């Protein structure tokens, strides 16, 4: 972990001092890191690609609205992202080099880059269907359009 990553992480309400920060996953949009703390908890640190998401405030407000709704509807707390706030209560950090956010890491979870079996396809469909069902009553008009005309 370099000094810059450490300085970024110290701005968030983590359970303890960051002990490690390593690149994580194969994302194509944001830069993602797995963070472990001295307290044993893990987090996901992401540098948001503000060239793709020009309205970072709107993006983060969308995430807050959707995760709050899902948390009220879902019987499984592991199925909903937990956003970690900055020490001044914000959902993301604006630094000299861009925008950063932190989520609690979901232990024993996986993220497939490509389904390998029929079961992978099935579980992906179940997850997506459950997500859609839980959002059925969500007031979509509250969401910001963070990438203009993306859905057109």
Write out the residue ranges for each language-model feature.
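Juxta-kinase regulatory segment immediately upstream of eukaryotic protein kinase catalytic domains
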Residues: 1-22
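Conserved ATP-binding subdomain of kinase catalytic cores across diverse folds
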Residues: 20-43, 47-152
